[in-house]
C-alpha cells in the first residue's frame, strides 16, 4: 500500500501548483540554503547519478533522506518534490512516531493538504 499511496501523492503536487509551492517553501526553510547533494552521497548507493536531495535532519527525526529529493536543477526550478509522498507514507505507517519525532513536517503536511480546494 505504501507504494500506491506514494505514487498517487505525486499527483497532488502535479495537479495543485500551490502544493508544490508550499513544498518548496517548507524545504527551503528546513534546509536553510544547503546545497543539493547526490542521493548516493546521502544514503550510500542505489540511485541514479542525477537523483539529488537536500540534506536535513530527516533521519534524526525518524524519516528518510529521500524526503529531501527534488526534481529539477534547483529548489526554485523544481518541478516536483518527495515531501507529500514520503509524508503521507509515514503518516499512514507510523502516525504517532511521526507526530512525536517531526511535528513540524507533519503539521506542514496536514495544513497543506487541508488547504487544497475540494
Model-derived regions: residue spans:
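Active-site-flanking segments in enzyme catalytic domains
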Residues: 1-118
